[in-house]
Swiss-Prot record:
Domain of life (superkingdom): Bacteria
Species of origin: Macrococcus caseolyticus (strain JCSC5402)
Molecular-function GO term, any one: DNA binding
Official protein name in the record: DNA ligase
Catalytic activity: NAD(+) + (deoxyribonucleotide)n-3'-hydroxyl + 5'-phospho-(deoxyribonucleotide)m = (deoxyribonucleotide)n+m + AMP + beta-nicotinamide D-nucleotide
Taxonomic lineage of the native organism: Bacteria, Bacillati, Bacillota, Bacilli, Bacillales
Active-site residues, as the UniProt record annotates them: K111
Keyword NAD: yes
Enzyme category, top tier: ligase
Residue ranges of every copy of the BRCT domain listed in the record: 585-663
Function comment: DNA ligase that catalyzes the formation of phosphodiester linkages between 5'-phosphoryl and 3'-hydroxyl groups in double-stranded DNA using NAD as a coenzyme and as the energy source for the reaction. It is essential for DNA replication and repair of damaged DNA.
Pfam families referenced in this protein's UniProt entry, alphabetically: BRCT, DNA_ligase_aden, DNA_ligase_OB, DNA_ligase_ZBD, HHH_2, HHH_5
Transmembrane segments: none
Cofactor(s), by name: Mg(2+); Mn(2+)
Record CDD domains: BRCT_DNA_ligase_like, LIGANc
């Protein structure tokens, strides 16, 4: 046997033993035998690097570190699921489904508490692995995913498709990681989910390999790649070709059986070797999934039931007040630090005066804390039988804790507000919002630096940011030359932002990012917008009377007029530079059309096509309905194309779309 033949044999043996151990949980050889063969292959590849391949079992131990993760568009968006928190929510979901498609069965699966990933295979070889990211674009973590032994590097059949699943850290691996961190004096990981996410984002895959991650696969981008007619059949076929799926799933005939499954796992979840945070319920029949379709954010045929949040008792030591950019006074509970759902909680929002009175929350009380949606800490209730003697009902102040101005409560609102336009806290919060990523996107201006600039009287409003001098900034603590130069470059770059970013950055009450875009596109310039009336504004889709009145009042304020003049004087762009209504009129093919993309696109990515069509005024949706104007079908388009044909909706090829875009 020559060296090439031995390498091939080692590949086959190691892949087989790996599958038996990590997927089937039924090893046929001891660990020592596997390790012996693996080290033999490592030695051969070290001496003959030309024999090392991308699917070699040795990639399981990690490879050369990378400097950063590449951003890659998903071929099909990785949508999140809608959430249910009660039986009532699930019954409402069941009714919506049955109203549209009649009786259904549900495939019910454990919701693994990990990190969603997609795995791409070409001719049966694993070639790319991405994080969910924002659902449209993920990070390429292929090398790190290759260290997860349950992910097959090659399949038994030469399929070209994308499979999705949840990478996670087993509890045993999590305990081992924290034991090691404690030993070497490093901070402990908060919970297995955070540890798994951090492990998969290590730039050195050798570190990822040491974390002993695992994975369950739960879906294929196009389930017909497996010739499956249902979710249950698709999962069985994933098992057959070498993937690891979760076998605690169950096919339920009705919601009563779903409730039984939820009740069982609510009680038994702690017996598992991994964390789960809920149950996923999916319509089993794929044809009915297609019929139900999607919303912009999630499939209509699936929902995630979230387990009730863990509740713990701690002491409320104080109530701290903060002032937001619109003057709203928000009370925050300062708690005796306590572990809740894996992380330490020391603060929780009390929202407003009414909530404090309704729950009779007092300083010194023992309170029940939980995380809403297992994310945001909240005070659930007071433990009255533990209330210390001498506590007094908490009263919100009558004057602003920042500027001393009288606080007011506007009719119809629950919040107390400081209406002093010169309030220090409001001005600082306004600047923080102005520089944020979704507004003017001035990188390097964090909350601490903004507060220093304001307290040192270097800035008094957002316009002063454009007068910052290098020499003055260098005198500030922790502001070195590189940091200052980077900050000044970011400020200069922000001058060219399109009008919608400036509008949103100004923090106008009731005006969000979407409305800012609508107004910028509609009016084109700040001058045009200044001349708008409430009547003209309310004629625009998505602009209500409250928003219109707030905008007109804001732009007529003398201080704001002066502020905008200063910003323009300092070179800040006051025009909309994106695609305008006039541009849309130049593209009558796609302007104001509802378009559905389906199948595999090969010339453009799905996100590129969506962006191009949207910029020309099209509305891109996921479901084919009577309101759809055009269906653009790539290869393997499936049921959406069939539905378009049945409704008489024009079906275009990808090339036809590209030709129209070019023209």
């Amino acid at each position: 046997m020559n060296i090439e033949q031995r390498v091939t044999e080692l590949h086959q043996l190691l892949h087989q033993y790996n599958y038996e151990y990590h997927v089937q949980d039924n090893p046929s050889v001891p660990d020592s035998e596997y390790d012996k063969l693996l080290h033999e292959l490592i030695d051969i590849e070290r001496e003959h690097p030309e024999l090392k391949t991308d699917d070699s079992p040795t990639v399981r131990v990690g490879g050369t570190p990378v400097s950063a993760f590449e951003k890659v568009d998903h071929d099909t968006p990785m949508l999140s699921l809608g959430n249910a928190f009660s039986e009532e929510d699930l019954l409402a979901f069941d009714k919506r489904v049955k109203d549209e498609v009649g009786e259904v069965e549900y495939m019910v699966e454990l919701k693994i508490d990990g990190l969603a990933v997609s795995l791409k295979y070409v001719d049966g070889v694993f070639v790319q692995g991405l994080t969910r990211g924002d659902g449209t674009t993920g990070e390429n973590i292929t090398q790190n995913l290759k260290t997860i032994h349950a992910i097959p590097l090659t399949l038994s059949v030469p399929l070209t498709f994308e499979v999705r699943g949840e990478a996670y850290m087993p509890r045993k691996s999590f305990l081992a990681l924290n034991a090691y961190r404690e030993k070497v004096g490093e901070p402990l990981a908060a919970n297995p989910r955070n540890a798994a996410a951090g492990s998969l984002r290590q730039l050195d895959s050798k570190l990822t390999a040491k974390r002993k991650l695992d994975i369950f696969l739960y879906s294929v981008n196009d389930l017909r790649e497996l010739n499956a007619q249902s979710q249950s059949e698709a999962l069985d076929k994933l098992d057959e070709i070498g993937f690891k799926t979760n076998h605690e799933r169950k096919l339920c005939r009705n919601m009563e059986e779903v409730f039984e499954y939820i009740k069982y796992w609510t009680e038994k979840r702690n017996d598992l070797a991994y964390d789960i945070d809920g149950i996923v319920i999916k319509v089993n029949d794929l044809s009915k999934q297609d019929e139900l379709g999607f919303t912009a954010k999630s499939p209509k045929w699936a929902i995630a039931y979230k387990f009730p949040a863990e509740e713990v008792i701690t002491t409320l030591n104080d109530i701290e007040l903060s002032i937001g950019r619109t003057g709203v006074v928000t009370p925050t509970a300062i708690l005796e630090p306590v572990k809740v759902a894996g992380t330490t909680v020391g603060r929780a929002s009390l929202h407003n005066e009414d909530l404090i009175r309704e729950k009779d929350i007092r300083i010194g009380d023992s309170v029940v804390i939980r995380k809403a949606g297992e994310i945001i800490p909240e005070v659930v209730r007071v433990v009255l039988d533990r209330r210390p003697e001498g506590t007094k009902p908490y009263n919100m102040p009558e004057i602003c804790p920042s500027c001393g101005h009288e606080l007011v409560r506007i009719e119809g609102e629950v919040a107390l507000r400081c209406i002093n336009p010169k309030c220090d806290a409001k001005l600082v919060e306004g600047v923080i919002h102005f520089v944020s990523r979704t507004a003017m996107n001035i990188d390097g201006l964090g909350e601490r630096i903004v507060e220093v600039l304001y307290n040192e009287d270097i800035i008094n409003d957002v316009a002063d940011l454009y007068t910052l001098e290098r020499e003055r900034l260098l005198t500030l603590e922790r502001m070195g030359e590189k940091k200052v130069d980077k900050l000044l470059a970011a400020i200069e770059a922000s001058k060219t932002n399109s009008l919608e970013r400036l509008l949103f950055g100004l923090g106008i009450r009731h005006l969000g990012a979407k409305a800012s875009m609508v107004l910028a596109r509609e009016f084109g310039t700040m001058d045009n917008l200044k001349n708008a009336t409430v009547e003209t504004l309310t004629q625009i889709d998505d602009i209500g009377e409250k928003m219109a009145q707030s905008l007109v009042t804001y732009l007529q304020n003398e201080d704001i007029i002066n502020l905008l003049e200063k910003l323009e004087q300092y070179g800040v762009n006051m025009r909309y530079t994106g695609v305008t209504k006039d541009d849309i009129e130049l593209h009558p093919v796609f302007g104001e059309k509802t378009i559905v993309l389906t199948g595999k696109l090969t010339i453009m990515s799905r996100s590129e096509a969506t962006k191009a069509l949207t910029n020309l005024g099209a509305k891109v949706t996921n479901s084919v309905t009577k309101k759809t104007d055009i269906v653009i079908a790539g290869s393997d388009a499936g049921s959406k194309r069939e539905k378009a044909d049945s409704l008489g909706i024009p079906v275009w090829t990808e090339q036809m779309m590209v030709d129209a875009l070019r023209n």
